[in-house]
Regions:
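Short amphipathic alpha-helical segments at helix-loop
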Residues: 144, 182-183, 260
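Terminal, charged accessory segments of proteins
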Residues: 1-179
């Protein structure tokens, strides 16, 4: 089990806003589950946003009025017979806090009130909800989570990201159709967080490298590329023409068993080999080094991969990162990968 405190550190790299001074005290708090951690982040983040002021936008509103405002909705006025009362249905834009971002935050806070978090935290969230009295609750199943951000709403990006993790990583539907907030993120959400954490860690802690989630082009003999999938890397680290491609893996089992023998997951190995060989061919006319690594989140299995293979002229490594240790140990392992790959 990954300590909740380490999940906070992973989140702080995935969401750079969490490294601001306002959130520093969260690093020293003890959280008994991930739901409590997310609630604390939202609690702090919303409080900061309230000091700036809740975001506002022009929101369409329709109501019965005695004087014309905006556009007259004739058909609706006739249908509701408001004209008999010397009123009419008008549709206009209102500059309001009832925006979708605020609706997402309010709805997520209401979900957290049903979760296994402390009463103190619930009381704090209820106090914050008072500032959202003019904001509607929405069904988070139908939210478009990929909305663009601009200068006016940039401060919401981390808050909405945490709401997304709570809804998609902690909310679980029971057999009777009801929902329950789980204590810890599901495997799929932890996998995405693990990938994002690794990429952002290397971006921040190793600025001497270029760190990106780059695509690799298929090296084809002709122009036929129909139906070929994109080769999307998790992390590509480069320094000049020295390149390390890392494929981050967060599984319940790091190896597979075949007739009682542990082996690496075939698909994982085929994937990283394909990435490396296509990148190798792309740079064939330049002086370069391309290597690959499968970096598993370590489980409690007896077999822990720590292997390096030389395959057709390229180095492919398999490592395990122990997330169940003090974060300084995690950082040391990640830094050691750079030392061995770029400073030899």
């Amino acid at each position: 089990m990954i300590p909740v405190q380490n999940i906070y550190y992973m989140l702080s790299y995935a969401f750079q806003a969490l490294q601001a001074q306002n959130y520093k005290n969260l690093a020293t708090e003890n959280f008994h589950n991930t739901a409590e951690l997310c609630a604390a982040i939202l609690d702090k983040g919303i409080s900061i946003q309230l000091k700036r002021g809740l975001g506002r936008d022009y929101v369409p509103k329709s109501e019965s009025l005695s004087t014309l405002q905006g556009k007259l909705n004739i058909s609706e006025s006739i249908k509701t017979q408001t004209l008999l009362k010397k009123q009419m249905i008008c549709t206009y834009d209102e500059f309001s806090t009832n925006t979708q971002f605020n609706q997402i935050i309010k709805s997520t806070m209401l979900l957290l009130l049903k979760s296994n978090i402390t009463n103190t935290r619930k009381k704090s969230l209820r106090n914050l909800l008072l500032f959202f009295s003019d904001v509607n609750e929405i069904d988070l199943r139908f939210v478009n989570w990929n909305q663009p951000y601009n200068r006016s709403n940039q401060s919401y990006q981390m808050l909405i990201g945490i709401c997304y993790l709570i809804y998609n990583g902690l909310l679980q539907t029971q057999n009777d159709g009801t929902t329950k907030i789980m204590d810890f993120f599901d495997e799929q959400r932890m996998c995405r967080l693990y990938e994002k954490f690794l990429l952002e860690y290397y971006r921040k802690e190793h600025p001497e490298l270029s760190a990106n989630a780059s695509q690799i082009a298929w090296q084809l003999d002709d122009s036929e590329n129909q139906l070929l999938p994109k080769m999307q890397t998790d992390i590509m680290l480069s320094q000049g023409n020295n390149i390390l491609i890392i494929d981050a893996k967060y599984y319940s089992h790091m190896t597979q068993q075949h007739y009682g023998t542990n082996t690496l997951h075939s698909n994982n190995l085929y994937q990283i080999f394909t990435y490396v060989k296509n990148k190798e061919f792309e740079l064939r006319k330049l002086e370069h080094t391309v290597s690959g690594m499968l970096l598993y989140a370590q489980t409690d299995e007896n077999v822990i991969p720590n292997n390096t293979y030389q395959m057709s002229g390229n180095q492919i490594s398999v490592r395990a990162l122990n997330l169940n240790q003090d974060f300084s140990g995690i950082a040391h392992t990640l830094d050691d990968i750079i030392q061995n790959s770029f400073n030899n």
